[in-house]
Amino acid sequence: MADGLSLLPLGVSSWFATRPGEKAEKGEAVAIREDVGAFLVSHADEGYRAFQAKLIPNIDAATIVGVRTPELRKFAKGLARREDAGEFLAALPHGTFEENQLHSFVIAQERDFDKLVGEIERFLPFVDNWATFDQLSCRGLAPNPDAALAKARAWLESDHEYTVRFAIGVLMELFLDERFRPEFFAWVIGVSRPEYYVNMMRAWYFAEALAKQPAAAEAVIASGALDEWTHNKAIQKAVESR
């Protein structure tokens, strides 16, 4: 394992290394550490790593291993079934981009609503890029819409960029159909943030609303309630999605 770890980007995940006195027995934290590390090493692709680094320029390229998403998804399915999966989920912050991707895929498989919310809230503060965010599904919140809506309302008030983006995503994914209420538009309009990815999500929300709630969304667009950038971007995305 030591030789394999040397292939990872410099400075990545001392969490993988066996510590003095630890035994790599099944069910212990060290076992899942080494298994995740071995998986990343064996599936690393330098060319893909360079591609990812260009695609996600706001994160340190040294934290990207270069493992493709289908491989991560496949590995995460097995990871989620392990008795020691909680050891991996608790090891925040992770040292690599790929660990964050795995984390998103693992918690997406949680079916207990309260546990899922707990894992989402534990992980969201460590989400720092659009690619990891896009893998963090909110569909598991659908069985309990009242509680999901209350959480979305609270997350909108967060100081953290991707927590706010996730809240808007919940409103977009779960509350633009039969559960829609016009007041939700006011919630999203009321989000005033400088971050590009928050404002892009606001625009995406209204683009989806134009398709799913056309009368209500068109009235908001026509009213001038949106800032100019979000107004124009929402219309652009709506046109592109036709």
Predicted regions and their residues:
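Alpha-helical scaffold domains
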Residues: K26-R242
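N-terminal amphipathic/hydrophobic targeting modules at extreme N-termini
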Residues: L5-L7
